């Protein structure tokens, strides 16, 4: 059995040299230094094996040993090669294995950033936009003063005028007084604009009723709160309202001064024309003022023509007129006064135009 092991070692060098020649140039450089050593060591057993083979040639048959040599040479020759190639190949594998880790780090960061941005920037749907727009529209057109606030505001005007006076003269104190009665913290401008709208609403309701042939007593509303608000507005801005009678009593007797054009006519015309022009000037100048009450209109008319012979002043006439029952007849008289004032305005405009024409003619005659 010993000679068979020796024969296996003898034929290993030639097989390894053939595989090294077919390999890469880098492996040939590394294996070239090791091959001579193996060849030298392998040559010694060849001599021994040759002697043993000669001695055994007579004893054993040769053809049985040759196929055993060829079968076992391939694994013996290939054993040192994978060790060198494996050691050389493991180095680049370790270097290349680290690179995907470095490249994977920024990719993971990018994924985190994209996931964060997707989480933050959510797309807004059409339903959400409609909800937002509807909420904004409700806030824009939301009613500040409720119906109960309007009634409290009107009642506050009546109470304030009875205790402290006209709210328009001391509007700051009135706003402080009314804020306690309203459910929200209203500003001064909001309160003033609301008063103007309530007054306009009352006047429009009265005008519409008069067009239909009805009086203030006949005006009715479907809701109880609206009816109550109208009754309070009537106490404030009606013919016998607190603010209407208060304004008339606070004004002085006499109207606005006559226009300058009227004075020019008086100085430029002859005596007869002066006498005819003076009488209507006084009466019309007194009556044209739209802010006057009916009592003051009558007082100014009587005092303009008769002086103090009647013994009637503005306060007594306004007080007596306030006692007149509020009804259809009283409303008709007030409407007639309004129409008369409108006609007086038209007459005043016509007269001013006539004055301008006469003044131009006088000026031309004076220059010539």
From Swiss-Prot:
One of its GO terms (biological process) is regulation of DNA-templated transcription. The keyword Nucleus applies. Changing residue 348 to S: Decreased DNA binding. Loss of DNA binding. Residues 1-123 are annotated as: Disordered. Keywords: Nucleus. It is found in: Nucleus. One of its GO terms (molecular function) is transcription cis-regulatory region binding. Residues 17-31 have a biased composition (Acidic residues). The keyword Cell inner membrane does not apply. GO terms for cellular component: mediator complex; nucleolus. Residues 84-97 have a biased composition (Polar residues). Residues 35-47, 100-123 have a biased composition (Basic and acidic residues). Transcription factor that binds promoters containing the CryR2 element, 5'-ACATAWCT-3'. The DNA-binding activity is decreased upon direct physical interaction with the mediator subunits and is modulated by redox conditions. The oxidized protein is the preferential binding form. Mono-, di- and oligomers. Associated with the Mediator complex. Interacts with MED6. Interacts with MED10A, MED28 and MED32. Interacts with DEK3. Belongs to the GeBP family. This is GLABROUS1 enhancer-binding protein-like.
């Amino acid at each position: 059995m010993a000679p068979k092991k020796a024969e296996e070692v003898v034929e290993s060098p030639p097989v390894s040299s053939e595989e090294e020649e077919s390999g890469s140039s880098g492996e040939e450089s590394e294996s070239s230094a090791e091959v001579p050593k193996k060849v030298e060591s392998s040559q010694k057993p060849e001599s021994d094996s040759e002697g043993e083979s000669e001695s055994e040639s007579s004893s054993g048959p040769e053809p049985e040993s040759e196929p055993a040599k060829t079968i076992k040479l391939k694994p013996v020759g290939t054993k040192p090669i994978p060790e060198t190639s494996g050691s050389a190949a493991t180095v680049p594998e370790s270097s290349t294995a680290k690179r995907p880790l470095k490249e994977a780090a920024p990719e993971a960061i990018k994924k985190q950033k994209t996931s964060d941005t997707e989480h933050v920037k959510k797309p807004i749907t059409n339903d959400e936009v409609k909800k937002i727009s509807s909420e904004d529209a409700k806030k824009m057109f939301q009613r500040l003063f409720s119906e109960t606030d309007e009634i409290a505001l009107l009642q506050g005007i009546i109470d304030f005028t009875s205790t402290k006076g006209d709210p328009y003269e001391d509007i700051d104190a009135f706003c402080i007084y009314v804020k306690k009665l309203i459910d929200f913290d209203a500003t001064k401008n909001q309160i003033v604009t609301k008063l103007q709208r309530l007054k306009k609403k009352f006047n429009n309701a009265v005008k519409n009723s008069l067009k239909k042939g009805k009086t203030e007593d006949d005006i009715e509303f479907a809701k109880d709160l609206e009816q109550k608000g109208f009754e309070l507005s009537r106490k404030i801005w009606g013919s016998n309202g607190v603010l209407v009678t208060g304004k008339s009593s606070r004004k002085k007797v006499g109207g606005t001064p006559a226009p300058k054009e009227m004075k020019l006519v008086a100085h430029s015309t002859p005596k007869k024309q002066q006498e005819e022009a003076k009488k209507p000037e006084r009466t019309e100048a007194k009556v044209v003022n739209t802010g006057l009450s009916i009592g003051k209109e009558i007082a100014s008319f009587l005092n303009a023509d008769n002086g103090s012979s009647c013994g009637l002043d503005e306060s007594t006439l306004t007080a007596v007129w306030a006692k007149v029952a509020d009804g259809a007849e009283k409303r008709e008289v007030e409407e007639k006064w309004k129409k008369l004032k409108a006609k007086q305005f038209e007459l005043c405009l016509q007269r001013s135009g006539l004055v301008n024409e006469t003044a131009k003619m006088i000026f031309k005659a004076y220059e010539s």
